[in-house]
């Protein structure tokens, strides 16, 4: 075994008919973890329903359907490899909850692949005011996905016919737009592809001799590897907390920042319970330490299942422990809300694993979505498309952090009417004093070591 490959998480964004599923399916199909038998089965099924031209997207649709029905599928199906890296597609926007997933995301995306339909009329629809291309690019950037590869897809369409002119036109327009969003255009690579025919996906296309740049796979290989935040203080939001006979209370969650080791004294907020970590397990194996990205179960002493629950955050008692938030100030972008939002609006916020109503106590100012400049002080109300600075008050105990300190605990989705109506990133938090909480005997003993 040589050096371990770099792991990168990707989100695929773009307008509804840009060909995301076909392009993504193609990569997974050619470089991924789907075995030949499964593909042959998919091909046969696609042919049987007369959708043979749909086989790559079919791969993705099958995976999506299984995912939505709650069948946990082998994550290898969402992976593909290049000589240098292993890529995991963590989400593709066909999902109803795409935006929510991107925020509370199973994991932060390291880069976005923006797929654009080059065909006449389709590109224009995607980039128009109502098109999702703009919305997705802005969302990705706001949520901290700073690297992007842009694919000009459907170069094989008869209105494009692998032409350079159309490609240049699209590059110019998309560059101008993503620059406005905040991306550094110098670092964004554009690749003309056909997700269906396979041009420039993995091998250079002979049909576009005018294009001298990398293929899509090569462009993905040129992305900068992510820096995992293991040097920050520990933050581990709980997904569940179970009682296991003979072992005791086992909280389960994903380490977002920092490191956790057996013997550590940890505090859970907002529950305000402090105890010792006895042991840590991942995939039924004992771990000497858990680092960012690890989904772990850990055994804690003298704590009952009633004390801690999903949405609580675990941190190291001696190193900036998490605390309950009294209130917080956030930059909020309203995506789709039918009416006006004023002070007193109290929707549910999904932030890391917590799902809690928060009141818009005070809309402090309306700001420009891109530059952040103030447009209006204390507006009466805000509506779809607006960005604002809002002071929010959780209606039940909740633990959140400033986005710049602990990104996964500092971004949230605002849910109302069964959809994501807004997204936000937290700029400041007023924390409650964490004294006077429950400290277990085990914690006292371990602290003396």
Curated annotation (Swiss-Prot):
Its main location: cytoplasm. InterPro entries: EFTu-like_2, G_TR_CS, GTP-eEF1A_C, P-loop_NTPase, T_Tr_GTP-bd_dom, TRAFAC_GTPase_members, Transl_B-barrel_sf, Transl_elong_EF1A/Init_IF2_C. Phosphatidylethanolamine (PE) is a direct precursor of the ethanolamine-phosphoglycerol (EPG) moiety. It comes from Trypanosoma brucei brucei. Residues 91-94 are annotated as: G3. The gene is TEF1. Residues 194-196 are annotated as: G5. It comes from the Eukaryota. GTP binds at residues 14-21, 91-95, 153-156. This is Elongation factor 1-alpha. Belongs to the TRAFAC class translation factor GTPase superfamily. Classic translation factor GTPase family. EF-Tu/EF-1A subfamily. One of its GO terms (molecular function) is calmodulin binding. HAMAP family: EF_Tu_A. Residues 70-74 are annotated as: G2. Keywords: Cytoplasm, Elongation factor, GTP-binding, Nucleotide-binding, Phosphoprotein, Protein biosynthesis. Residues 5-230 form the tr-type G domain. This protein promotes the GTP-dependent binding of aminoacyl-tRNA to the A-site of ribosomes during protein biosynthesis.
């Amino acid at each position: 075994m040589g050096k371990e490959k770099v792991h990168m998480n990707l989100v695929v964004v773009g307008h509804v008919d840009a060909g995301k599923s076909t392009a993504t399916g193609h990569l997974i199909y050619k470089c991924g973890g789907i075995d030949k038998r499964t593909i042959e089965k998919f091909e046969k099924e696609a042919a049987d329903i007369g959708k043979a031209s749909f086989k790559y997207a079919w791969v993705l649709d099958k995976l999506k359907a299984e995912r939505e029905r709650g069948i946990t599928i082998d994550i290898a199906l969402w992976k593909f490899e290049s000589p240098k890296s292993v890529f995991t597609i963590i989400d593709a926007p066909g999902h109803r909850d795409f935006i929510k997933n991107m925020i509370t995301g199973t994991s932060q995306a390291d880069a976005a692949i923006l797929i654009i339909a080059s065909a006449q009329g389709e590109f224009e629809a995607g980039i128009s005011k109502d098109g999702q291309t703009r919305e997705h690019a802005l969302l990705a950037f706001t949520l901290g996905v700073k690297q992007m590869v842009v694919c000009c897809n459907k170069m094989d369409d008869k209105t494009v016919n692998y032409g350079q002119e159309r490609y240049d036109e699209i590059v110019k327009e998309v560059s101008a737009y993503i620059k406005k969003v905040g991306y550094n255009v110098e670092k964004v690579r554009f690749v003309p592809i056909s997700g269906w025919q396979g041009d420039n996906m993995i091998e250079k296309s002979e049909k576009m001799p005018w294009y001298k740049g990398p293929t899509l796979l090569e462009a993905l290989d040129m992305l900068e590897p992510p820096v995992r935040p293991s040097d920050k203080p520990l933050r581990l939001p709980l997904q569940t907390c179970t009682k296991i006979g003979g072992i005791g209370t086992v909280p389960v969650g994903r380490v977002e920042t920092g490191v956790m080791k057996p013997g550590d004294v940890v505090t859970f907020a907002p529950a305000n319970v402090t105890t010792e970590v006895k042991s840590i397990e991942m995939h039924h194996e004992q771990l000497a330490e858990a680092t960012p990205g690890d989904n772990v179960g850990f055994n804690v002493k003298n704590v009952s299942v009633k004390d801690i629950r999903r949405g609580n955050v675990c941190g190291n008692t001696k190193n900036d422990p998490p605390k309950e938030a009294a209130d917080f100030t956030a930059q909020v972008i309203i995506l789709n809300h039918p009416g006006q939002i004023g002070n007193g609006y109290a929707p549910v916020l999904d932030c890391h694993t917590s799902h809690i109503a928060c009141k818009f106590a005070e809309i402090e100012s309306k700001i420009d979505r891109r530059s952040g400049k103030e447009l209006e002080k204390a507006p009466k109300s805000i509506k779809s498309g607006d960005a604002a600075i809002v002071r929010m008050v959780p209606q039940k105990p909740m633990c959140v952090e400033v986005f710049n300190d602990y990104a996964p605990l500092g971004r949230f989705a605002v849910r109302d009417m069964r959809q994501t109506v807004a997204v936000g990133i937290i700029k400041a938090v007023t924390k409650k004093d964490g004294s006077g909480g429950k400290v277990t005997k085990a914690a006292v003993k371990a602290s003396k070591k």
